[in-house]
């Protein structure tokens, strides 16, 4: 039977790097990519977001105004709860469809790449959970550079999520994706050998 492996980490820990390494051997169900599809222009979920947050939640072409929404929800817990309430079920449904499709290949395992895996309860369907980690200083630096944020704005985004230490404590496997990519690759390959035939 195909195993479901959860992959998560804190913001800017380098989870996408690990996901790309895993994708060389196993199918990936990427919650972020699915969310972009579910929240695309004209989609029912996008319409519900606009109904709740107003027209400023979308750009002129109908795509979500993600910078505006991000600024809002990372500074307002109630707004984050409202957005999550609108998006959670449609994204979960689309993810289950993607899992069924990936399982048609009969892989050894399917990777569920879910940034908010514990927060959304996906760990309950996983056989194992991998958590990608990096030091707080590295995470802050990466987030500021990647998203062009001030230190204060980056820290607010980090603080809005479950603490990385809690995720690590709940992990079956921890992959350190600090400064050395070669060590990260070695850790991923070592873990893959335990899963793949």
Swiss-Prot record:
It is an enzyme of class 2 (transferase). Keywords: ATP-binding, Coenzyme A biosynthesis, Cytoplasm, Kinase, Nucleotide-binding, Transferase. It catalyses: 3'-dephospho-CoA + ATP = ADP + CoA + H(+). ATP binds at residues 12-17. InterPro entries: Depp_CoAkinase, P-loop_NTPase. The keyword Transport does not apply. GO terms for cellular component: cytoplasm. This is Dephospho-CoA kinase. Belongs to the CoaE family. Pathway: Cofactor biosynthesis; coenzyme A biosynthesis; CoA from (R)-pantothenate: step 5/5. It is found in: Cytoplasm. It comes from the Bacteria. Its EC number is 2.7.1.24. Catalyzes the phosphorylation of the 3'-hydroxyl group of dephosphocoenzyme A to form coenzyme A. GO terms for biological process: coenzyme A biosynthetic process. Residues 4-197 form the DPCK domain. One of its GO terms (molecular function) is dephospho-CoA kinase activity. The keyword tRNA processing does not apply. Its main location: cytoplasm.
């Amino acid at each position: 039977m195909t195993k479901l492996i959860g992959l998560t980490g804190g913001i800017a820990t380098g989870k996408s790097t690990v996901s790309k390494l895993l994708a060389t051997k196993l199918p990936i169900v990427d919650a972020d990519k699915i969310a972009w599809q579910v929240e695309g222009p004209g989609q029912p979920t996008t319409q519900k977001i606009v109904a709740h947050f107003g027209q400023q939640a979308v750009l002129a072409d109908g795509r979500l105004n993600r910078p505006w929404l991000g600024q809002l929800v990372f500074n307002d817990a109630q707004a984050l709860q409202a957005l999550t309430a609108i998006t959670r079920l449609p994204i979960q449904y689309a993810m289950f469809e993607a899992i069924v499709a990936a399982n048609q290949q009969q892989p050894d395992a399917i990777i569920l790449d879910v940034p908010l895996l514990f927060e959304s309860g996906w760990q309950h369907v996983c056989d194992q959970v991998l958590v990608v980690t990096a030091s707080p200083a590295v995470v802050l630096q990466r987030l500021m550079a990647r998203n062009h944020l001030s230190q204060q704005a980056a820290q607010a985004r980090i603080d809005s999520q479950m603490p990385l230490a809690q995720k690590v404590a709940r992990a079956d496997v921890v992959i350190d994706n600090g400064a050395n990519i070669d060590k990260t690759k070695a850790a991923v390959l070592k873990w893959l050998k335990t899963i793949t035939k």
